[in-house]
């Protein structure tokens, strides 16, 4: 039981360092860009599939 407590404590410390540091803002910016890229790719895939069936 103590082993799991130490493991979760270490994970919490790592998450705090990454979250409270400047890495979170940079990752959020990259995530926004990737969201729009994959949204466009999904729409293109749906449209090409719709036109291919006709």
Curated annotation (Swiss-Prot):
Domain of life assignment: Bacteria
Entry-linked InterPro entries: DUF1328
Subcellular location per the Swiss-Prot or TrEMBL entry: Cell membrane
Main location: membrane
Keyword Transmembrane attached: yes
Membrane topology summary: Multi-pass membrane protein
TM ranges: 5-25, 27-47
GO cellular component: plasma membrane
Keywords: Cell membrane, Membrane, Transmembrane, Transmembrane helix
UniProt similarity note: Belongs to the UPF0391 family.
Listed name of the protein: UPF0391 membrane protein Bpet1858
